[in-house]
């Protein structure tokens, strides 16, 4: 496989490492057995045989993941997954970002990372409705997924590359 390199290595606008938690149940999340204070990202994941797959990727900015998962749209998503895949024990993995440059975590940065995660991890069974068919940003972005990354690609990049 051919290797590609950043055209402007020192000009990556958004460089983030996301530490993904081990899978946790909804019950563990709602019983506050999971530290979710720093999590900005989450994924609904299911185990198929020996492999985990991500079926939904989302973000939170002004609320906790547990609060988000009590909202009506997420209750509908859980019901849809339980209906489509009744034998799967759905779990969550929470993502804590570490932005590798000076600056605040902003809504725009979180939105850009979420969009690229969704777009780059799409497959036929994903239940995300937006950000699956296209992604655009005026930023060059590098995401390194770390920790429990079985359902994810280790690196996702967006920008001008050369070979």
List each language-model region with its residue ranges.
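Boundary/linker segments flanking structured domains
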Residues: 1-55, 60-163
């Amino acid at each position: 496989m051919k290797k590609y390199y950043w055209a402007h290595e020192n000009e990556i606008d958004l460089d983030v490492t996301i530490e993904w938690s081990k899978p946790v149940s909804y019950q563990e999340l709602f019983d506050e057995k999971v530290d979710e204070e720093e999590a900005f990202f989450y994924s609904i994941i299911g185990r198929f045989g020996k492999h985990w797959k991500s079926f939904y990727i989302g973000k939170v900015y002004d609320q906790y993941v547990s609060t988000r998962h009590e909202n009506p749209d997420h209750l509908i998503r859980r019901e849809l997954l339980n209906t489509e895949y009744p034998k799967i024990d759905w779990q969550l993995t929470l993502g804590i970002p570490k932005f590798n440059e000076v600056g605040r975590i902003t809504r725009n940065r979180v939105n850009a990372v979420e969009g690229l995660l969704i777009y780059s991890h799409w497959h036929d069974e994903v239940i995300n409705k937006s950000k699956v068919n296209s992604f655009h940003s005026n930023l060059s972005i590098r995401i390194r997924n770390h920790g429990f990354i079985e359902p994810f690609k280790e690196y996702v990049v967006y920008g001008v590359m050369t070979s």
